């Protein structure tokens, strides 16, 4: 198991990040090599509205014709990425922002013609990430990828999972606005694939938590060994630097 940690921060969380989050990143960086992947859904939706372009999604994926792809690229690779980089550096965390098209970092396979320029990660060029980390920087990745000479939108969860799996990361951390999976008001500290399926069937997991755990399960299938779902507005690291939240693994069940 490597000493890499991949942190995935959804677009809806970016404006909620506080000093506690950046302190947690500092603690993680003391023990591990950290890579951050971010989304940008709310900002993309707002910019599309400004441009009078309809927002359409299918099965959780943004339908991305060429005119939408131009806006997605502008937002993710521009304002969203640079705001997060500047916030990290404001907290004395040196960061370099880049997208998956830089250095062919994220290569993709198109999902389907019906949803346009949307791809899933097929290859990660880790040399760029490792080089930045070895120079003391935190790579901050916008989920844009390439296929041939075309640029594609990538679901940020898929991008983070692909990077974590290729790096053989110790852990993939999903930053959310809740403490993790709750069962009867109590935090579920550890769970696995079969238990999550039961939780969804019985209504323990509902609403916005469903896509989060589905992303966690998809990450496990891609080869990530451990997933943590944590609250990014609270201290989610212990003194040891281990995550506090819900841990999802392939074969752990609650006693």
UniProtKB/Swiss-Prot annotation:
It comes from the Bacteria. The keyword Transferase applies. Disulfide bonds: none annotated. Its EC number is 2.7.2.8. One of its GO terms (molecular function) is ATP binding. Substrate binds at residues 40-41, 62, 153. InterPro entries: AceGlu_kinase-like_sf, AcgluKinase_fam, ArgB, Asp/Glu/Uridylate_kinase. SUPFAM superfamilies: Carbamate kinase-like (SSF53633). Its main location: cytoplasm. GO terms for biological process: arginine biosynthetic process via ornithine; L-arginine biosynthetic process. The record marks 8, 212 as: Transition state stabilizer. GO terms for cellular component: cytoplasm. PANTHER family: N-ACETYLGLUTAMATE SYNTHASE (PTHR23342), N-ACETYLGLUTAMATE SYNTHASE, MITOCHONDRIAL (PTHR23342:SF0). Belongs to the acetylglutamate kinase family. ArgB subfamily. This is Acetylglutamate kinase.
């Amino acid at each position: 198991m490597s000493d890499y940690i991949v942190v995935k921060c959804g677009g809806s969380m970016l404006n909620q990040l506080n000093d506690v989050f950046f302190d947690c990143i500092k603690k993680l960086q003391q023990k591990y090599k950290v890579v951050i992947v971010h989304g940008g859904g709310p900002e993309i939706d707002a910019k599309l509205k400004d441009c009078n372009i309809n927002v359409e999604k299918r099965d959780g994926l943004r339908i991305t014709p060429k005119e939408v792809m131009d806006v997605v690229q502008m937002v993710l690779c521009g304002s969203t990425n640079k705001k997060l980089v500047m916030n990290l550096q404001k907290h004395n965390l040196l960061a370099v922002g880049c997208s998956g098209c830089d250095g062919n970092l994220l290569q993709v396979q198109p999902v389907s013609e019906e949803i346009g320029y949307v791809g899933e990660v097929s290859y990660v060029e880790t040399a760029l990430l490792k080089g930045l980390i070895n120079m003391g920087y935190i790579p901050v990745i916008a989920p844009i990828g390439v296929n041939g000479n075309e640029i594609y939108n990538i679901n940020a969860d898929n991008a983070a999972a692909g990077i974590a799996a290729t790096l053989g990361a110790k852990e993939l951390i999903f930053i959310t606005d809740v403490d993790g999976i709750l069962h009867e008001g109590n935090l579920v500290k550890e769970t696995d694939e079969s238990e999550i399926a039961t939780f969804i069937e019985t209504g323990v997991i509902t609403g916005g938590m469903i896509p989060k755990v589905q992303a966690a399960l998809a990450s496990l299938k891609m080869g990530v060994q451990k997933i943590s779902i944590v609250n990014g507005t609270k201290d989610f690291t212990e003194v040891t630097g281990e995550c506090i939240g819900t841990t999802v693994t392939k074969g752990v069940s609650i006693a």
